[in-house]
Amino acid sequence: MKKVIAITGPTASGKTSLSIKIAKKFNLEIINCDSLQMYQKYDIGTAKITIEEAQGIKHHLLDFLTPGTNYNIYYFQKDARKKIEEMPLPLFVGGSGLYLKSVLFDYELTPKSLFLPPISLTAIENMVDFIKKKDPQLIANLDLKNPRRILSAYQDLLSGTLRSQKNKKHNPLYSSLIFYLDIDRQILKKRVILRLEQMLKKGFIEEVNQIQTFFPNANFNIIGYREIKVLLEGKITLDQAKTLIIQKTMQYAKRQKTWFKNQIKPMILDALSPDLEKTTIGLINNFLKTD
């Protein structure tokens, strides 16, 4: 099997910094695995890597879609697998777990619901409530930041199918070394708060305003962008928006960790360890020695 490496973890856990160090050490190119960072203009609010931060490391499937473009996990699976075949040793970086799993495992996808019109936030919330009642086990594994995944699960339940009880293929297609950067929840919260303040200083509110102005069909059902949009509509204050963003980010991080541990079973690393880089390099060297 072809070897693949992935670095995952919650927002503000240090994925970007570690990935650049690893890419430079092993002369690798990076495949982005953050579903939001694939879109242009969503820069500040997604903490998208900058040219300076990339330090010359080539990134694929990053910043290549116009806001509002119909692109989802179905297309990503195909594009990412093509990239894997083009690289000696691909390095995936990002926290979109289902996207990563769809690529690395024998995950069957169909292009259904690719060209549906935008879904309102109220409709999404109603669908989530319905899913919780009908199939509670599914919620822990569902990407609640992705309206299309919510709609797909909702449609399955309407047809009488409990998706959590489906027999899916989980056979690996590649020999994968997947790292998950774990971090103490209280420290993570402090980092999230600090990062949000930095985003606001960099112009996060103006970024949302620009996207809304020039791309009215763009997706705003995203943590951070949704709250800033509501702020711009005058429905909440800045302090309320900040509180909501922090709260929802932490809730998502908790679900994210549960999902990765149950679905992918990655190698969990201490994101705050002073030996993180050294440990990661050692594990990769051992991985590359195996057949």
Curated annotation (Swiss-Prot):
Q: Superkingdom, according to UniProt?
A: Bacteria
Q: Which residues are the signal sequence here?
A: none
| UniProt keyword annotations, A-Z | ATP-binding, Magnesium, Nucleotide-binding, Transferase, tRNA processing
* EC numbers for this chain: 2.5.1.75
**What are this entry's molecular-function GO terms?**
ATP binding; tRNA dimethylallyltransferase activity
Q: Name one GO biological process term.
A: tRNA modification
Chain positions recorded as substrate binding sites: T11, A12, S13, G14, K15, T16
What reaction(s) does this enzyme catalyze? adenosine(37) in tRNA + dimethylallyl diphosphate = N(6)-dimethylallyladenosine(37) in tRNA + diphosphate
Residues reported to bind ATP: G9, P10, T11, A12, S13, G14, K15, T16
Which residues, by range, are in coiled-coil regions? none
What InterPro entries does the record tag this protein with?
Dimethylallyltransferase (IPR039657), IPT (IPR018022), P-loop_NTPase (IPR027417)
Q: Return the annotated site residues (Interaction with substrate tRNA).
A: S96
**Region (Interaction with substrate tRNA) spans which residues?**
34-37
- Spell out the subunit comment: Monomer.
Please give the family membership noted in the entry: Belongs to the IPP transferase family.
Q: What does this protein do?
A: Catalyzes the transfer of a dimethylallyl group onto the adenine at position 37 in tRNAs that read codons beginning with uridine, leading to the formation of N6-(dimethylallyl)adenosine (i(6)A).
Specify the protein name. tRNA dimethylallyltransferase
**Source species, please?**
Aster yellows witches'-broom phytoplasma (strain AYWB)
Taxonomy of origin reads: Bacteria, Bacillati, Mycoplasmatota, Mollicutes, Acholeplasmatales
